[in-house]
Amino acid sequence: MERWWFNSMLFKKEFERRCGLNKSMGSLGPIENTSEDPNLKMKNIHSCSNVDYLFGVKDIWNFISDDTFLVSDRNGDSYSIYFDIENQIFEVDNDHSFLSELESSFSSYRNSSYLNNGFRGEDPYYNSYMSYMYDTQYSWNNHINSCIDNYLQSQICIDTSIISGSESYGDSYIYRAICSGESLNSSENEGSSRRTRTKGSDLTIRESSNDLEVTQKYKHLWVQCENCYGLNYKKFLKSKMNICEQCGYHLKMSSSDRIELLIDPGTWDPMDEDMVSLDPIEFHSEEEPYKDRIDSYQRKTGLTEAVQTGIGQLNGIPVAIGVMDFQFMGGSMGSVVGEKITRLIEHAANQNLPLIIVCASGGARMQEGSLSLMQMAKISSALYDYQLNKKLFYVSILTSPTTGGVTASFGMLGDIIIAEPNAYIAFAGKRVIEQTLNKTVPEGSQAAEYLFQKGLFDLIVPRNLLKSVLSELFKLHAFFPLNQKSSKIK
């Protein structure tokens, strides 16, 4: 009869790793939490700071191709962990009936003659380390037919690279559940089973209604990276300038955050804050009227329109600045956006101020028809007077995404054009081009790095350097901080 060898481990202490690892991942044993909170000993309180990774990616290849591990946490809850490297299967289960059978076999084998003949685990972190034989008639796949539930998801933060050998989290159930907000409710009272694919690997998740509620409850605390699909804690993301701490990708920023990044504290003076759209062409949609949609975005973002304009100081240098906000109807340019930017340019021309416009837009706003298209010409006309007649300095900053009418007008009219790393910059989007021309758009052909090589703009500047770069550019063009300017006049 065919038999299989398995490794089984029963940890002496709780299954525990902190997010900041304080032991080499080369060792498989549990790591003690030196800053343990006594409140965490309560059985029904879970914390992601309590447990982190089970294994590092490099550890997984130290095991044979078909392994099962038995682990126990500080609450006495046991879990079986099953690896099938050859078939790329990773499953975790806390099925009590199966675990009882496993522990029974484990205990019987521990007292067997094989163990008494001298086999001992060498790792001091294990209570025991052993191998035992198990008849395949019981079918391990049937016993371990469900994987980690949300309790372990919130504590272990499973790295899908264990399964796929890559650093991508894109198809992970855990990350989808936290970030997408998709409905995970089940008609079953006690829980349900969900199977997903992760880079060609089968992953079965056992869910419970309480776990799903926890997932939805804390979803708002995280922001998922568009590039690596890793999770970034929202509370810390702002201090990191909305740059992914895992891959360095520049995530979208609100207009208020950009103003805070560029403008000196206490110097911001907004303009035309009370200007709102009145639905000039009375655009009506069966799904949602235009005015209702405007109202919903105003409540959601706290803004009146898709751009903020005003006067402020950048390292002491007075500047006029307009910042578009993609969160407000995709940063689309309607009559109010066009009017606010035009007034900003005219005010900068009258006050002899350098001008900055931060672009983040999907283009002209279709709900306002040709009036939105006319904003392109109106803004370009105001810039013509500002740049050629007044001989003043305009810096255009292109962020992701900058497309459509904004790209075709003031986005590309800067005396200096700066792009953020990996910014998506185009006139027509990839999908529109492919559907119109029936041609495939090459991957990366609308990214900032590729367009920079083609000479489309002057600089690619990371966010952490942007303010200092702008300051040097203004000084180069004879715009100095107020205190330096007054001292030179004296």
UniProtKB/Swiss-Prot annotation:
Induction: Not induced by light. Gene3D superfamilies: 2-enoyl-CoA Hydratase, Chain A, domain 1. GO terms for biological process: fatty acid biosynthetic process; malonyl-CoA biosynthetic process. Keywords: ATP-binding, Chloroplast, Fatty acid biosynthesis, Fatty acid metabolism, Lipid biosynthesis, Lipid metabolism, Metal-binding, Nucleotide-binding, Plastid, Transferase, Zinc, Zinc-finger. Pathway: Lipid metabolism; malonyl-CoA biosynthesis; malonyl-CoA from acetyl-CoA: step 1/1. The keyword Nucleus does not apply. Zn(2+) binds at residues 225, 228, 244, 247. SUPFAM superfamilies: ClpP/crotonase. Its EC number is 2.1.3.15. A zinc finger (C4-type) spans 225-247. RNA expressed in leaf, root, stem, and tuber; the least expression occurs in stems. RNA persists even in senescent leaves. HAMAP family: AcetylCoA_CT_beta. Component of the acetyl coenzyme A carboxylase (ACC) complex. Biotin carboxylase (BC) catalyzes the carboxylation of biotin on its carrier protein (BCCP) and then the CO(2) group is transferred by the transcarboxylase to acetyl-CoA to form malonyl-CoA. Acetyl-CoA carboxylase is a heterohexamer composed of biotin carboxyl carrier protein, biotin carboxylase and 2 subunits each of ACCase subunit alpha and ACCase plastid-coded subunit beta (accD). Belongs to the AccD/PCCB family. This is Acetyl-coenzyme A carboxylase carboxyl transferase subunit beta, chloroplastic. It comes from Solanum tuberosum (Potato). The lineage of its organism: Eukaryota, Viridiplantae, Streptophyta, Embryophyta, Tracheophyta. The gene is accD.
